[in-house]
Amino acid sequence: AVRSGARQVSLPRHHYGDYPHAARLWQLPVVPRSPHVGGPGLHWACAPSSPLGLDEDVWPLWASPAPAGAWRVLDCAYAPLQLEPAAVRPNLDHVWQMWTPNKALGMTGVRAAYAIAPVQATPQELAALRDLAPSWVVGAHGVAMLQAWTTPQVQAWLQASLVQLRAWKAQQVQL
């Protein structure tokens, strides 16, 4: 994003400490988040939001492609664990998606992820992302987790886990 002209970062109200830390490293100011922030910069959202699990407030703005110089990134770390469908479904064609299955697999110490580019990503943006890839060190354990994530057995296990999590949630609600 910085290489493409980003000059600021907007974050969800509740966000991971990694986000503002990375912004400081790149000397980008963190600006107050509003559903209307959308100009040049790096704009983060989470689906579902963390830690509340609610829908983000940016989906109306993010329904259309990002304007020039704006990078929209959706952190999908908790999406596989979402127990109910989102009230508002974001149009994922217009955002960079970051997925890490570590939380869904109960492997929070394993740091490995993958990105899905927006439909309108340019060949130059994709090449720039690939050029950065060597700086993202992923150990053999992370590679194994990402490879396992796509298997039918792991996806079946996840679906069975969601059934159990929904049952536990229903029990807690009744308390």
Predicted segments — roles?
Residues 97-173:
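PLP-dependent aminotransferase class I/II
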